[in-house]
């Protein structure tokens, strides 16, 4: 499966030196930006173990990559604000990872997990209103179970774009580790802080 992972240049250096790279939680941008990502990341790890197999010894968190960006399965446009705003030199590493070693999910709907929200997955407003009413009527203990089960809808990545529901526009990929032999191409980008 062709994917694109955005990493600081240091990751590319480590990958070239060691032949393999695993997420270092102490240096991972999103794990150190003031938000509490432990619970959602641990949930994703549990889903990966259930769906693609146990993590290798020593792996704590997965490597993240793009599969689909703005409805297209191609390298993300590094000129967009999301990428241009990064300080320091970064790399977009094009990789080919075996399909059975990758778990795909909808990046926009991943925010239901990140924010600890119930995800109804409704495709139209009436369905949403019914789902929300049924969810809100549940006892608190049951709500937690139903909410966590609802998050599994993020793995539905078939493109849908309606007035009420969208999925598949941005598809992210997670896998346990990155190896040098998976690399097809590296593109450098980024900037340094102004004075």
Task: Report residues per predicted region.
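Conserved NAD+-utilizing ADP-ribose enzyme module
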Residues: 1-2, 9-34, 59-61, 70-195
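Short, well-structured hydrophobic secondary-structure segments
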Residues: 37-73
